[in-house]
C-alpha cells in the first residue's frame, strides 16, 4: 500500500489552479471581478494571442495597501470576508482568496497598484509561484495586473486550449456579460491592439445592449420587472423576431454575478413560448436582486452556479414578470379607446338557439359535484335524473351553468349543417347516462345509450358576462367566414382575421383553468385502480409534492416499494389517460419547479381544450360567429392560444393599400 504524502506548495497551487484557471477567459473573469470589487469606474482589458501571450487589466479602483501586495498572492488571503459566517452574507464577487495565487502559479504575473493617498505606487512580480520584492513604481491611482505566458509550466493544460480565435471569442463573451452586469462601469477591450468593445459607463443598460448586440436587437426587446419583500427581478426579453437556435444570447445575473441556471432560463422560455410559435430560444437579460443570505454562491469552483433557498418562488416571479410584459405588448397592439372600454354594454336579450347534437361515444359531460356521488352510487340516472339532481345540487355552484358539451358537435359536411358552440346546460335538462371515462376495460363500465338527443336550450347570454367587463379588443363587425376557418371582421378601417379554432380553444382553456384555480375540481373515482411504478427519483419527488397532487384531485396510496395505487383522478375536459396525466404533471413539476396546481396542469388542459374546440373547416352561422367573438373579447388573453399561436391578426387600411400599390 502506498504511503500518504503531503503535497508541496507548488503542486497544491497547480491543482487548485486547475479548478479556478481553466483557460484565459477564466483569468480575465477573476481579474475583472477584483477590479469591480475595488470600486473601479473604468476598466481596460488588453489581450494578445487569445490571452495566452498577454492579459493586462487596468483599473482606477481603490488600489492595494503596500503591506497587502505580497499577501494578496498567498493562498486563501482575501479582504472580502473574515470568518465562516460571512460566507452566507456575500456582497462581493470574490471572497475565497484563490484567484491570484492560482493565476500566479501557472503564469508570469506583474502587479502594480497605488492608493489615492500614496505618493508612489508599488510593484511585485511572481513567476511560477516565486515572488520578487515589493518595490516603488510610478502609476496612477488603481491597479495594473499583467499575466504573460499563461500555462508556461503546465504544458498538459496548454495543450487542451482551443485556437487563438476561439479563446479570444470566449474572453469577449465574458467581458460582454460583465459589462451588462455593470452598466455604470466603462469597459474597453483590446484584442491584439484593436479595440473590439467600448461601453460608456453611463448607467443605461439599454445603451450597453445596443453597444454589444446592435440596433436590431435593441429595437426588439421588452422591459420586464416584478418585486416582493424578498426579491426583485427585472431585465429585457426579446421578441420572436430575434429568437435564436441556441441559448448563447441569454444572460442571468444574481446580485450582479453572472451565473448559469437552467431552471431560471426555462422560466423565461416558458413565458416566451406562450406568445411565440417559433421553436427557438428567446433573447433575454435577467437580473435577480435577492438578500445574500437566501443564496449560496460557494458551491462551484468558478462560482458559475449558485443555490437558492426557494427556487420555485423565484421561478414563478420570473415567469410572471416576463409573461406580463409580453402580454401587455400584445394588448397594446389591439388597444381600444377608453370610451369604448368603459361604455355600458346594452342588456342582452334572451334568444332561442336550437342545437342538433348527434350521438358520439360521450353525449354530455355533467360538470358538477354531483358527478362523484352519482358514479359511486351507480344509480340509473335516466329514471331518477331530476330527483337525484335536486338532492345533490349545490346552489353555490352558480346553478351548474358551466356544463360543457364536448366533442358532441358533429356536423354533416355534405348538407353543411351548422356546427354548434357549447353553451350552458340548464339543471333540468335530461341526462341519459354518465360514462366512466377512465374504465374502458372494466366489466362494470356503464354503457352509453345509442339514441341521439336533440336539445332546445334557452341561453341567457347575460349570465356569462362578468360585472364591469373589460373588453380586450374593439367590438368588430363580423363580415363573414373565410375558408370555413377564419372569421373576418372590421372596425374603424382595420380588417381583423380570427382563427375560429384557436379562439374557441382559448375560451375553453381559460374557463377550465379558472375552475381549477377556484378549487371546484370534480373528482372521478376509478372502478379499477391504476398501478403506477415509479423510479426512486420520481417517487422521492412525488413524496415532496404529494400535497399538490391531492389538491389537484388525485387520490394516491402506497402500493409497496416505489409503486402507487391511483384511485381517484380529476375530471375535466373529458377523457384522459389517468396514468399519463399523473406522469405529465410529475414531469412538469420536475422540469419547471412550479408548485401551482393550475400551472402544472397547463399542458393537459391545453391539449384537451384543443380537441374540444370547433375545428377549421367547420361552417359557422352568423349568430355563432358573433357569439364566439363576443366571448373572446372578455377573456383574460384573447390574442394567443394555449400553444402560443396567434388568435387574431389585423391589417390597417394602409397595410392593404400598400399591397395594392396604392401608396408607396
Swiss-Prot record:
One of its GO terms (biological process) is mismatch repair. GO terms for cellular component: mismatch repair complex. InterPro entries: DNA_mismatch_repair_CS (IPR014762), DNA_mismatch_repair_MutL (IPR020667), DNA_mismatch_S5_2-like (IPR013507), HATPase_C_sf (IPR036890), MutL/Mlh/PMS (IPR002099), MutL/Mlh/Pms-like (IPR038973), MutL_C (IPR014790), MutL_C_dimsub (IPR042120). Pfam families: DNA_mis_repair (PF01119), HATPase_c_3 (PF13589), MutL_C (PF08676). The keyword DNA repair applies. Keywords: DNA damage, DNA repair. GO terms for molecular function: ATP binding; ATP hydrolysis activity; ATP-dependent DNA damage sensor activity; mismatched DNA binding. It comes from the Bacteria. Belongs to the DNA mismatch repair MutL/HexB family. This protein is involved in the repair of mismatches in DNA. It is required for dam-dependent methyl-directed DNA mismatch repair. May act as a 'molecular matchmaker', a protein that promotes the formation of a stable complex between two or more DNA-binding proteins in an ATP-dependent manner without itself being part of a final effector complex. NCBIfam families: mutl. This is DNA mismatch repair protein MutL. It comes from Clostridium beijerinckii (strain ATCC 51743 / NCIMB 8052).
